[in-house]
Each structure stands twice: as C-alpha cells, then as structure tokens.
Regions:
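Conserved phosphate-binding elements of NTP-dependent enzyme cores
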Residues: 1-944
Length: 944
C-alpha cells in the first residue's frame, strides 16, 4: 500500500519502507488518533481551523522525535537543551530524527539578518578567516607576513641586477635626540644612517631636534641583486628585521619598498591581528564597529519628530517631548534663549530667524539645545539599559523622537576598519553581504583562489552556494544578505527560516512544516512546492500542516482532520492520496462542490485616501488611491512591496497624523484624505500575551464582565465579595498554593520540568471559598472552561458578553476555551482574537482597519466566515485594507491594488488596480492569471 502511495509525481516508485505509525494520539483535542504516514513522501495534514492539525504534527510527531533525540544524549548535555514534554500517545513507530519549522514571527532583533539566520554569513566568516587577504585599513595596501627568504626572493624576481640597499627603520615619526640609539648602532659596527631622508656618517654628529618627529633608517647592506648574492641578501634582511622590530626598507634603483614579517603595514605602522571568524562578527567585540557596536546605525534625535508641526506656537505644546512633562525650569530656559535671539515663544518654529532656530535646536554658549539635551538623556538611558526597569521605560518614552541614522564610522557595514580591510576577490565581507542572494553565488564562484587556498574554499563554499540556490529557488533572490530580519514580510521570513533549516541537503529526516505557503503568491508557492518535492526526493519525509489547495493536490498523502474544531475536532476524516479525498468538508471545497461566492456588487466607496510618491524600500515613487468605506486588498508577488506600502507608510502615516507615538512613516511625499479618518487599527499576528495567565477572556475584556457578573450573585454580595475576588492574578480569591496558575512546576534538572495539577485547587485556579459562589450552577472556573460556543448559550443574557462572544464565534473561534492560555494560540488565532476585540467595540464608523494576511491558519470554510465579518465592518462605514494572497479574499474585495510585477528591485510598481474583474484583465499581473480562474468558478486555487 505505502509503496503505491509514496510514489513520486514522475511515476518512479519508492522502495517498501515502514510507515510512521501513530497510535492513540490524545494530545489536546485529538481523540485517540491512529494514522500511518508513508516515509519519503510529501504528507499534508489539513482540516478546519482548530481541528487538531498542529497537535498531531508538532505536539505529537515532532515532539516525540525531538524527545527521543534529546534522551539519547548524556545527562550533562540534556541540561543545556530545550526539552518537550512526552506527548500523550500510545506509540509512534518508524520515526526518524525530526526538524520542525513553525509559522512564527522572526526575530525582531536588529542584529538578526538574512545572512545570520541562514548561517551563510557564518560560513563567510570562516572563509575570510581562512583565506582572506588583509590590507592596511589606512592606505589600503596589501598586508602580508613574509620571512626574510620570501622577501629576498621577491626582490631578486623584480630587481634584475639593479643595486639594492637594505635599511632598518629604527625610528618612524618619533620625537627625540636618539643619542643612546645612535651610540648603540655605532658600537654594533654600523656606519651609515639616513635621517629624515638625508644620509649621515655615524662617526659625525647627527643633527636631531628633540622637539620634532624624525625618521631614522640604518644602512645594513648595499649589494647587487644577483642570484649568487641570495644568501647574503637574506642575512642582511634578517639583521634589518631584527633591528627594526620586524620591518625592513629596501631601495631598488632608487625606488623604496617596505616589507614586514608580521601582519602589519610597514608604511603606516598599523598592525593587524591574526584573522579569526570572530574578527568578522558584528556580534563580537573583536569584530564589531566600536562606534555603533555592530548595529550599522546610531540613534539621533529627529527634529521633525520633536517639533512635528512647525506652524504651532512653541509655547503651545509644539515641542512634543515637553507637552506634558515640561517643567518651570525648562520654560524659563526657553524664554531666556528666546530673549537672547530676538524671538518669542508665541511664534512657531517656521517663523524663527535662522540663528534663533539654530540656538533653540542645537544650543548656544548658555543653552544646551533641545536636540543635544534629548540625545544626552537617550544615551544615558541606553547606558543604563541593563539597569532598573524605570530606566528602560524612560528610554521607551524618548524613542518616538529618535531616528536611526547610518553609522558615520563604518557606513552601515557594522565591522571594525581592520575587519573591513580584509578582502577576497577584491571585496570585503560587508561587500558580499550587501549583494543580493542572486548576485552572491556568481560573485563567490568568481573568486580566484590560489592553490594553497583551494582546500579551505572547497570545504566551505559548496554549502554556501547550496543555501543561496535554495533561497533563489523559493523566490527571495532579491533580498540582500545584510537585510535585517525585522524588515521582512511574513512570507519572506518563513522562506529564510526554511533555508536555514533545510538548505543543507540532509537525508533521512522528518521535516514538519507549519503552513509554508503563508505570505506566498501562487506563483511563488509553485516554486516552494518544487523545492519541497526535491527535499522529499533526497530521501526525507516532509509533513506539512496546510490549507492551500495547490499544496494539498501536490501531496503524496493527505490526512484530513475534523469534522469541526475544538471538541468537535480531533478525528481523522480521511487519510490517503488526494485524488480520493471526497466526503469531507475539505474534499467538497477541493472538488468545487462548495466555494466562496463572488459578491454580486462592489462598493464604490465614500471618499479616498491617496498616498503620493511612496518610495520606501523598493517602492518606485508610486501614487496609490485607496477608496474609503471599502474592503481593499493589496496583492502581488512576495516581496513586491505590499507590507512596505500598507504597514510602513499607510498605517504609520495615519497613526502619526492622529498624534500617536509610532515609528517614522516610510518615505513618501504626502497622504491626502486622512482628515476623514478618526482612528486606525493594525491587527497583526503577534501574541496576545506571553504568559499562561493571558487568555481570550482577559484580552477581549470578557473576564472583567464575568467577574462583575459573579460579584452580583446574592451569595457573593452576602459575603462582601467584589469583582476583584474573582481574579486569579491577585491575592484574595485565587489559590495561593499555585498562585492562580492551576499547575505547579516540578524541577527535574536533567529532564524537562514537569507540571502537575495543583493539589489544593485541582487545577481550578481559585480557592474553595471563591468556588462556592455559583452562577446558574457553575463556578467561575467552570465558566472559564467553556468554549466560546458553549458560553454563548450560558452567558447570552448578559448584553456585553453576548456581543463579545458572538464576535469570537463569528471569526471562527467558537472552539476556543475562554480560559485557554494565550501561549497555546497560533498567530492566526491571535490575530482573530484581536479582530474580535475590535468588533466588540462601538466604533465611530470612520476607522481604518489594517490586516496582514488575515487568512493565516484558516480553512476555506473559515475564510468564508471571516469575509462576512470584514463585510460587517465595512457596512458600518469603516475601511478595511488587507495584505493578502488568498484568491477567495481577493475576488471578494471591492478594490484591488496589485503590486509588482516582480519582487525586490523588479517590483515596487502598481501593476493593476480596480475591481477584481478589472485586475483579472491585466496581462502584466501575475495575480491576474490566477484570479481569472477563480472568477470563472474553477475549483479552489486558494485555501481548502
């Protein structure tokens, strides 16, 4: 059976191998799941959101593989590794080593780059340390360490039979009379010296001014450059090198050449340390630029952020940092500088004379200046960054007034001058890091390695070239290696992480991937599928949690979970090849029996927002119109500039216009029409909380209403319990044995910490007295254990709770328990909880909602429900702008802005815009090709 199922699409069979057999999996909502996954195959686990896909793939399959590997190590090694709990499963057989690549936010640390995440930069550091060619950081001349024999051979090779003088530079640019040194040279038998370019006999008085810098060179030998004189030349060079501490000056027919037997520039007297990988690390003090500590940029106070409105009177809150915190002393200092320079605080900055403006911003002899004052405070806070919490908070208060500016010392290269002066193929390591992925491989192949360098290069470069090739094959060849990972889109970040994990061409591995299609255009997804199949063909098992129809159809084997979510899920509805996936909800969408309908009409909008001259990152100075009161989708191939346009420019510009503290908007000329917007809300996929105490009830505010409801129960009122009694975060009503966690950790040292149910409260978080208060026969612990759908029936009489619960259910989260820990939620679930909270608020009807890939983690049936929710927002007079690749969402939009045509430097332009039908007619748009099919009603090409 499995030999047939595991056949590759080309028809080539695979040898009979034991499947990965999972028996009795009961993790989370799995109901004793049994399934057999064929080895050396592309396996897709699909099903409705919340049906248990991640529980099976990650919390069972990967967790068991990782646990077995860690337990095979010594007790000493295990204490340094993260260890997963043993999954609740009867058995897993046929399992080989497992690697998980989850769908999560990439590192937000500015030191993280594409090169470091993929380890390409680490390989380059080793390469440069092994065969890099040092140059002087001052004059740029090559720096080599040569023996006297090597120097002699170089002289004989180039000098012909010209006369050669060997001199020892005993003093270079030093002050002094040097009497002792000259006497010692005379006693050693030397007769001639050259001082500041003039020759003198040591037997005569040498005129030296002790107040001036001098150059003193001792003549060691003068001879003709003949092969017969080689031995004498070597001996003379060795004497000169000893006299001058490793440096010798050779004149050949009047031309001077400095040589050194250490890594030092003889001309500039600059020594270079022995090369090591850490010398090229911007995360190490040995390699990082001392000015910026390896960041490539430094903070500076931005005058435009400090005084954003140059037409507002200075004394009327124009100076933003001092709007609410300006003291009387600050006011007095400003009045003094105004009096000295002839202006008034009733004037705006724009009306000040140039000297007065300069004095106000940068200071004069009596006033420090606003910008230096704020910069001094920021630097003090940065210096205390490892200190008490208030210092970090103070820096965060200043951060909205700071901008990043390129480091003037390293010009963004992050490294010390000595490290940047090491070259290979005429380039520094920073030069290679600035290349795009597509440019880097040819540049590295073209390096002319010497024969002695080739063995080192041959051990390092193949792996680098392989990883670069993988990145190019999955469509991110336009990224540079030094691109900071916080600036990557979700799709770019996921593919970069993929390269870091699977670019090494391992074999016999079980790869477990979480929605690799997220953030990918359909064209890019085809490339990714080709790569996953190539990994499978190497002899690996690729297990993918996925909703994408393209991926499901391309699979060798499908496991479909359902039939619903949460407690209604956790059952295998189907397992086998995709061709016979019929009866389930997923199968009906795949065959086209069910589909998301195309709207019968498109909204025209109630006004417009216009972004003019957008040129951040790869945007090409484009003008973009967004109709208000519509669902607008920004589409385009991955890396075309969608997130830059929507997140970096639109959201930040609207937020700044509303007076919010935010990062500086991306470069653009103007944003027109913003006066029609009363609020802007970005709903992203970041976690709603980072501790087990945070949950959907606390985040949406439902817990506050539940606590208030319990405090009004007659029993609670009789006991004097207020709403705070029903909080598990504070003393009073919570169980003090576990401090409201419901579990207690047991330190296991060489094994993972075990968490056992609290004996005192039996996992219910509250003390006995609090749990004696009942609402319709349920304790507050019982209520928090209800799913959203169950809670609607129990708590529906409460108006505020009814609205909050209805919105959670409407966004497809009816299966979540109210008290479910936030750390267990996926990025897509977290985003929908945030969306539900926004829906539960009473808005003005003039809000712009910005969503980034809202269909992440959604089955196509859930996408249909999400579209209904977004339509409700728009029908209330709001505007929804979504960055999205899902074709069901694109076809349901009122207006589409398609960017491209390609990624990176080949993108950043508006390829097509208008209704989905208008965009589908474009011949330049990659999106149009796929959009035409779904508008015709062809079987699903998007999610399933």
């Amino acid at each position: 059976m499995f030999a047939r199922i595991a056949c590759s699409p080309s028809g080539k069979g695979v040898r009979q191998v034991q499947p990965i057999a999972i028996r009795g999996a009961r993790v989370h909502n799995l109901k004793g799941v049994d399934c057999d996954l064929p080895r050396n195959s592309l396996v897709v686990i699909t099903g409705p959101s919340g049906s248990g896909k991640s529980s099976l793939a990650f919390d069972t399959l990967y967790a068991e593989g990782q646990r077995r590997y860690v337990e095979s190590l010594s007790a000493y090694a295990r204490q340094f590794l993260d260890q997963l709990e043993k999954p609740d499963v009867d058995s897993v057989s046929g399992l080989s080593p497992a690697i998980a690549i989850e769908q999560r936010t990439t590192s937000s640390h500015p030191r993280s780059t594409v090169g470091t995440v993929t380890e390409i930069y680490d390989h380059l550091r080793v390469l440069f340390a092994g065969v890099g060619r040092p140059h002087c950081p001052r004059c740029g001349e090559p720096v080599t360490a040569r023996t006297a024999a090597e120097i002699a051979d170089a002289i004989l090779e180039t000098a012909g039979e010209a006369p050669v003088s060997v001199l020892a530079p005993v003093a270079r640019g030093r002050k002094g009379a040097f009497r002792k040194e000259l006497d010692a040279l005379r006693a050693a038998g030397y007769h001639r010296v050259r001082v500041d370019g003039s020759a003198f006999d040591l037997d005569e008085a040498v005129p030296l001014d002790p107040r001036r810098n001098h150059r003193i060179e001792v003549l060691v030998d003068r001879l003709a450059a003949r092969p017969a004189s080689r031995r004498r030349l070597i001996a003379s060079l060795e004497r000169a090198l000893d006299l001058a501490q490793g440096v010798v000056l050779v004149t050949i027919a009047g031309e001077e050449r400095l040589h050194s037997r250490t890594l030092a520039c003889a001309r500039c007297d600059v020594s270079v340390a022995e090369l090591s990988p850490r010398a090229f690390s911007f995360n190490s003090a040995y390699g990082a630029c001392p000015a910026c500590q390896g960041l490539g940029w430094r903070w500076r106070v931005d005058a435009d952020k400090v005084i954003p409105d140059a037409q507002r009177p200075l004394g009327d809150g124009a100076i933003h940092p001092w709007q609410s915190h300006g003291s009387a002393a600050v006011r007095e200092a400003l009045e003094d500088v105004a009096a000295r320079h002839g202006f008034s605080l009733d004037q705006p900055l724009a009306a000040l004379p140039r000297p007065g403006r300069r004095a106000l911003l940068t200071g004069d002899s009596q006033f420090q200046g606003i910008l230096p004052h704020l910069m001094g405070r920021a630097e003090k806070m940065l210096a205390l960054a490892d200190g008490p919490e208030p210092d970090r908070e103070a820096f965060e208060n200043l951060r909205p007034y700071l901008s990043e500016t390129e480091c003037a010392s390293c010009h963004g290269a992050r490294l010390r001058p000595e490290s940047l002066a090491v070259r290979l193929g005429g380039r520094s390591i920073a030069d290679y890091a600035r290349l795009t992925i597509a440019e880097a491989a040819p540049a590295l192949r073209a390096i002319p390695f010497a024969d002695r360098e080739r063995p080192v290069a041959d051990r390092i470069l193949p792996d680098v070239i392989e990883r670069l090739g993988f990145l190019e094959r999955v469509g991110v060849g336009y990224l540079t290696l030094d691109r900071s990972t916080p600036t990557l889109s979700a799709g770019e970040a996921h593919r970069v992480r993929l390269a870091g994990q699977i670019g090494a061409r391992l074999q016999g591995i079980v790869y477990v991937l979480d929605e690799p299609s997220v953030g990918l255009h359909q064209r890019d997804n085809e490339r990714l599928l080709g790569t996953l199949m190539a990994i499978r063909d190497l002899g690996n098992t690729v297990v993918v949690v996925e909703h994408d129809a393209q991926t499901i159809r391309a699979a060798d084997y499908v496991v479909d979970l359902g039939e619903g979510a949460g407690r209604q899920g956790g059952t295998v509805m189907y397992q086998g090849p995709p061709a016979t996936l019929n009866g389930s909800l997923t199968g009906r969408y795949l065959r086209g029996e069910l589909r998301v309908p195309v709207p019968s009409a498109r909204r025209a909008g109630t006004g417009t927002l216009r972004i003019l001259g957008a040129r951040e990152h790869n945007l090409r100075g484009i003008d973009v119109t967004i109709p208000l009161g519509t669902l607008t989708v920004v589409s385009g191939v991955s890396g075309s500039g969608k997130s830059t346009l929507v997140d970096d420019i639109l959201f930040r510009a609207l937020a700044a216009g509303l007076g919010r503290k935010t990062a500086a908007p991306g470069r653009h000329q103007a944003l027109e029409g913003a006066s029609a917007v009363e609020d802007v809300v970005a709903i992203d996929q970041r976690p709603i909380g980072r501790t087990p105490r945070s949950n959907p009830a606390t985040y949406t505010g439902a817990l506050g209403a539940i606590r208030e409801m319990f405090s009004l129960v007659p029993e609670a009122r009789a006991r004097g319990y207020r709403s705070g009694r029903f909080s598990f975060n504070v003393k009073g009503g919570r169980c003090e044995a576990c401090q409201g966690d419901g579990v207690r950790p047991i330190r296991m040292h060489f094994l993972p910490d075990a968490h056992v149910r609290c004996d005192a409260c039996k996992g219910r978080r509250y003390n006995r007295e609090t749990l004696e208060v009942l609402y319709h026969g349920r304790t507050i612990a019982d209520v928090l254990d209800l799913t959203v759908d169950e809670a609607e029936n129990v708590l529906g009489a409460h108006p505020r709770l009814r609205r909050l619960l209805a919105t959670l259910s409407a966004v497809g989260l009816g299966y979540l328990r109210l008290g479910q820990s936030a750390v267990t939620l996926s990025g897509g679930e977290a985003q929908r909880v945030k969306l539900a909270r926004e829906l539960g608020r009473r808005d003005t009807g003039r809000t712009v909602y910005i969503l980034d890939e809202p269909t992440t983690g959604l089955h196509v049936d859930d996408v249909a429900r999400l579209l209904q929710v977004l339509s409700r927002l728009v029908d209330a007079g709001n505007t929804v702008v979504a960055v999205e690749h899902n074709l069901d969402v694109i076809k349901s939009a009122d207006y589409v802005i398609d960017l491209g045509p390609e990624a990176g430097a080949g993108g950043g332009r508006v390829v097509a815009c208008g209704t989905p039908e208008a965009v589908a007619r474009s011949r330049r748009s990659h999106t149009a090709r796929y959009l035409r099919a779904v508008l015709r009603g062809d079987p699903a090409e998007g999610a399933a």
